[in-house]
Amino acid sequence: MIYSAAGGLYATTLGKLPAFASPSSPAGPGNYDLVAVRRGDPVSLYKRAMEEMGGMERYIKSGQTVILKPNASWDVPPERAANTNPDLMKAIVEDCFKAGARQVFAFDHTCDQWEKSYDNSGVANAVRAGGGQMLPANVERYYKEVDIPGAKRLTKAKVYERLMDSDVYINIPVLKHHASTTITIAMKNLMGVVWDRRFWHRNDLHQCIADFCLYKKPDLNIVDAYLVMTQNGPRGRSEADLTRMQSLLVSSDILAVDAAGALMLGHQPEDITHLRIAAEMGIGQIDLEQLNIKRVALD
């Protein structure tokens, strides 16, 4: 049985997000730092959020190559919500092409066997249905070592090379509980763009998560919070682990969107170690009171 939190979500989670507009950044589509939408299906949530963000055309120019980083790590079906929602993925791919993208690629360095994860998650079929290509990321030769200036622990990493060759980089995590890091959202999802994840786990995981954001932050972060795993993450055990929140978050600030997601899962952002470290490193804004935030309920 899946618990539904849609009725009280606005007051108890998204309602905690401040709706603040500074004089230097007037409110209105295209002027928001973060958009939070609730009460809809994954596609309608996404479309309204992007409308408030100013449209995908803000991020993609004609002829550009786009790479998408969903969560497609787990060999489980969509109804288990361990991976990014396939309907959302298809809508994003289509939107990228409408904005003028020449090519749209998606990939993940999966935790379970990659072909089964791609197929059974529904993500690969969704990307293809939208006209994009799902790329394999299971072989070390697909990765190139880079330096990460300013990092404290993760000073080097082997990064997926096609990401480096792309013009636009969009991060599409699913909001979940995680046994090792309490939450997994946008910052944690980037572990799927590197080859040696074991180094992170052996060398201060939270610091490595923050360090990697110094290399290349996504141009846009779209957080799937429609069906949310609130326990037994990141893979989950059954649908009993899930809460139907029917929400979606969008921001170009990877720390801000994680801070908002942390609140949705009932945590103060500063209590999540990698978020606090990222704030201290200047990765983004953890204080949501300093941002222009648009909250929308689709009734």
Model-found features: residue ranges?
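N-terminal and secondary-structure boundary signal
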Residues: 1-299
